Amino acid sequence: MPRRKQARRTTVRDIRTILRLTHEEGLSVREIAERLKIGKSSVSTYLLRSREAGLSWPLPIGADEDAKLERRLFGRAGRPPRDLSEPDWALVVRELKRKGVTLTLLWQEYRASHPDGYGFTWFCEQVAAFRQRTSVAFRNRHAAGAVMQTDYAGPTVPVIDPATGVIHPAQIFVAVLGASNLTFAHASFSQQLPDWIDGQVRALTFYGGVTKAIVCDNLKSGVAKALWFEPTLTATFAAMAEHYDTTILPTRSRKPRDKGRVEGAVLIVERWILARLRNRTFFSLAALNTAIAELLEDLNNRTMRHVGKSRRELFEEIERPALKPLPAIPFEYAEWKSAKVHPDYHVEVDKTFYSVPHRLIGCTLQVRLTHRVVEIFHDHQRVASHVRRSQRSGHVTVNDHMPKAHQRYANTTPANLIGRATQIGPNAAILVERMMRDRPHPEQGYRSAMGILSLAPRYGSQRLEAACERALTINAITYSSVASILKSGLDRERPQAEHAAPTPAHTNIRGRSYYQ
């Protein structure tokens, strides 16, 4: 015996078609059943229910949606009407952006205020349907405080140098927050690393907080190797991310959907800001940024059609509380370089030599340069810090970086040497002073003077003082002369005054009157 074919399940659309065929085309129950391939009893039941519900054709306003039509036809008699008030779907979607908020939680809160409301499955379906209807506004959904996306606009703005008349194209940096769409824009003269970093810092300052991640284009100025799984950032960009405790996520080349939020923000900035500035003339970057800031305020305060709130309102409501606080000190742009320590325990940076601890001779160190400071690192530990010289030459040395022997020599000054000689005696002080005075440069007499002082521990201060006196008497102002006097014991003998021989008479002798 052949099995009976199972009847097709009737949908609300079939019920609507039954009403239309009955009232518009005047078909009988049998004809409608044959056309729709459903049972005659089902057609009769639906027509009966429609008459009991007071429905005619065309359907009245309020009963033309599937859910409402089904409630009118199949509501149970004698049962109190259910509380089927629908939630504010825009509010539901905004709440989902908050950290920790789920569909289950929102449905539970909805049922707490509407105990006889819709079930969880229908609730989820309606949220998905609302998101689909507003796909332009919610295409790339991000949790509040999760991401800031950055990029440069394509068009530039001409800035005229008032002194030369030369036109400089200004690049427009754009940033946007993922959840609230709050937008930031700033003009600079290049897309190089200093301006790129400055744009990121200004954007975070504008938002008053830090997102968990920054999604950016893989500019060469910020990304050394644009690998999708393990991108390598430039040292300066990585230092900025570490300073703000955030993660940098470079996008793939030619993949605009990786940063779809900022792609849309760039388009809006071009239409709502740059297009309105097209007929204005700017003579400075500051004037251009002032104009951009004014239009940016209007843009962020304008109500978004699909959300019913402005970017600023959404930011204050859901995004600001989720941002991490800014560090106490803004990031200061710095260049990073590698430098090898020379045998004289200095590294060459920008044609100037800066000292490091002498134990690091031969090592390759990392150097961080700001406009004020030079910091030198070894294995991520700072080993030296110097004030940056404005002149690109010379040496900058810290005594503590020297070996002990070098420190003693570095601390030597004429006053220091004469003071130490004075403790031995007046003749020693005079001898040391003359040693440095008689040289073209005092430094040339340092070693001789230090040699004289080094004789005191061996021979004693009294003998050294006597030897210096004898050396002064015979005009032998050298270290070797004093050492020889001490070695031969001549310091114990009284020096004999030498009588100068009279000058022989000759024609070149000038009389006293010559000098009058």
From Swiss-Prot:
Record-level GO BP terms: DNA integration; DNA recombination; DNA-templated transcription initiation; transposition
Domain Integrase catalytic: 138-319
Domain of life: Bacteria
Keyword Secreted: no
Stretches assigned to the HTH IS408-type domain: 15-96
Keyword Mitochondrion belongs to the record: no
Region described as Disordered: spans on this chain: 493-516
SUPFAM superfamilies: Homeodomain-like, Ribonuclease H-like
Coiled-coil blocks: none
Keywords noted in UniProt: DNA recombination, DNA-binding, Plasmid, Transposable element, Transposition
An MF annotation (GO) of this entry: sigma factor activity
Disulfides per UniProt: none
Pfam families (UniProt xref): Mu-transpos_C_2, Sigma70_r4_2
Family the UniProt entry places it in: Belongs to the transposase IS21/IS408/IS1162 family.
Protein name: Putative transposase y4bL/y4kJ/y4tB
